[in-house]
Amino acid sequence: MVNRLPKNKVVGMKQSLKAINEKKAQMVYIAKDAESELFQTVEKLANEHSLQIVYVDTMKELGKLCNIDVEASTAVVLK
């Protein structure tokens, strides 16, 4: 696992879904402890777009990977 995600990323559900739908996403990170419905929505869309998904154990850990001081449910590395 990487220590930090690259700078060209978006964090959060709305921005992640937007990036995937606009075909700007390269890779998707999802926290395993994110709300079930949210988790499934992002996972399904990422699979539909044939994107690589990386599962992170906790939202706190994903927040740290994103270099933010709060928890994050999803993040997308942009092309």
Swiss-Prot record:
Q: Does the keyword Isomerase apply?
A: no
- Family membership: Belongs to the eukaryotic ribosomal protein eL8 family.
Q: Does the keyword RNA-binding apply?
A: yes
What are the top taxonomic ranks of the organism? Bacteria, Bacillati, Bacillota, Clostridia, Eubacteriales
Supply the Pfam families for this chain.
Answer: Ribosomal_L7Ae
> InterPro entries per the record?
Ribosomal_eL30-like_sf (IPR029064), Ribosomal_eL8/eL30/eS12/Gad45 (IPR004038), RNA_bf_YbxF-like (IPR023460)
Task: Name the species this protein comes from.
Answer: Clostridium acetobutylicum (strain ATCC 824 / DSM 792 / JCM 1419 / IAM 19013 / LMG 5710 / NBRC 13948 / NRRL B-527 / VKM B-1787 / 2291 / W)
UniProt keyword list: RNA-binding
User: What name has this protein been given in UniProt?
Assistant: RNA-binding protein CA_C3141
GO molecular function terms here?
Answer: RNA binding
